[in-house]
C-alpha cells in the first residue's frame, strides 16, 4: 500500500510540474508576458544602441538626484542603463510611466523596505552598481524614479523621452 501511495504522489508531483512548465512558456532572454508602459525588457544577448550611465547620489544641501535626469531615446532602441549608487543610503531606479510610478510610490510608503530586482527596476545599496537592458517600443514621456519614501520628494526622478 505504501509503495502505491508513494507512486501516486510522485506521479501527481510530476504532472503538476509539467503543467507549470507548460504554462510558463518559453524561457528566452528578454521574453516576458508582463506589459510595461515604457516598453519591454531588452535582450542582453543582442547589441545595444548605447549605454547610459546613471549615477544616484545625495548632495550637501539634502537633495537626492540622478545624473543625468533627462534622456532622449529613439523608439525601437535597445539601451543599457548602468546604474551606480554613489550615495550614502539605498536608492532605486524604477522605469515606468509617471502614473505607474505614482501608484508604486504609495505602495512604497506602506512597505519602505520593499526590495526591487525587476526587469524595469533595481534597488542598490551604497557603492553598489547594476544594469538594466531595456527596449523602448513605445513613443512618449516616461519616468525613472527612486520611490523609497522621501527620495522622490528630494528630487530623485528623471525623464525619458522616446521619439
Regions found by a protein language model. Name each.
Residues 83-85:
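Asparagine-centered strand-capping/turn motif at beta-strand->loop junctions
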Residues 44-47, 75-77, 135-139, 163:
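A short, structured loop/turn motif at beta-sheet edges
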Residues 88-126, 152-155, 159:
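Histidine- and aromatic-enriched segments that form or immediately flank copper-ligand environments
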Residues 2-56:
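Extracytoplasmic entry segments of secretory-pathway proteins
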Residues 47-78:
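N-terminal edge beta-strand
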Residues 25-33, 118-163:
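Extracellular/periplasmic metallocenter environments
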Amino acid at each position: 500500500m505504501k509503495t502505491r501511495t508513494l507512486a501516486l504522489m510522485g506521479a501527481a508531483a510530476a504532472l503538476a510540474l509539467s503543467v507549470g512548465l507548460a504554462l510558463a512558456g518559453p524561457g528566452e532572454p528578454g521574453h516576458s508576458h508582463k506589459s510595461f508602459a515604457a516598453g519591454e525588457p531588452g535582450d542582453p544577448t543582442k547589441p545595444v544602441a548605447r549605454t547610459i550611465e546613471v549615477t544616484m547620489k545625495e548632495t550637501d544641501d539634502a537633495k537626492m538626484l540622478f545624473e543625468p535626469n533627462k534622456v532622449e531615446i529613439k523608439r525601437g532602441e535597445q539601451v543599457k542603463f548602468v546604474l551606480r549608487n554613489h550615495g550614502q543610503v539605498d536608492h532605486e531606479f524604477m522605469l515606468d510611466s509617471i502614473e505607474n510610478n505614482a501608484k508604486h510610490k504609495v505602495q512604497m510608503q506602506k512597505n519602505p523596505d520593499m526590495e526591487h530586482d525587476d526587469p524595469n527596476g533595481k534597488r542598490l545599496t551604497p557603492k553598489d552598481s547594476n544594469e538594466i537592458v531595456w527596449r523602448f517600443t513605445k513613443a512618449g514621456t516616461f519616468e525613472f524614479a527612486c520611490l523609497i519614501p522621501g527620495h522622490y520628494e528630494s528630487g530623485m526622478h528623471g525623464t525619458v523621452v522616446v521619439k
